[in-house]
């Protein structure tokens, strides 16, 4: 089916190599938008909203690819973790956030939720305060990350999105009406990149190697 659409598009390149053991498909889409919401559009005073949960994709990958290191985790928990792969699209929340007047949006991939917060703040030329205790983490993610010794807040989190918007709670309520969990986890400021944990401020560092690659 992919080959049929490539033929219709009139382009494509296929290569077979021993180094790649699974199919890899990439594409570039060019189009027009009435309003572009980039990662660089956050404004000082905006709420920082996060959709879904930290570490979604990383949790699913671990539960599928690192079974030999997760023998202490129940099969029910592993199944729940693997099923998180069904939550990786952010199209729905992106459309809603756009309609609600979001100033910036960024999908959370490598570097995890903390990396995404750092990226939006620096791209926007702002500071940010991220409230660590507000970041939602599923129990299956906590169990698996604890077993593997990794930080879920620095784990690839495709399926989650960070959004800068003036009234975060209104967006959270609208997303909830559409079955999407969302949480206000911080605020954009004029300067300073911080994680606030139990009332204490710590520097929010530039993202390093994703926790996925440390296992």
Residue ranges with predicted function:
Residues 82-157:
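Active-site-proximal betaalpha loop/short-helix elements
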Residues 26-38, 76-97:
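Active-site glycine-rich loop that binds ribose-phosphate moieties when present
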Residues 176-215:
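Acidic, Ser/Thr/Pro-rich beta/coil linker or hinge segments at domain junctions
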Residues 6-8, 24-28, 46-49, 53, ...:
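Structural motif
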Residues 64-68, 117-125, 145-148, 173-181:
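Short, solvent-exposed amphipathic alpha-helical segments in soluble enzyme
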Residues 1-67, 187:
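Glycine-rich anion-binding loops of enzyme active sites
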Residues 16-22, 39-43, 61, 73, ...:
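Solvent-exposed alpha-helices and their adjacent loops that cap or buttress functional pockets
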Residues 164-170:
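Helix N-cap motif at beta-to-alpha junctions
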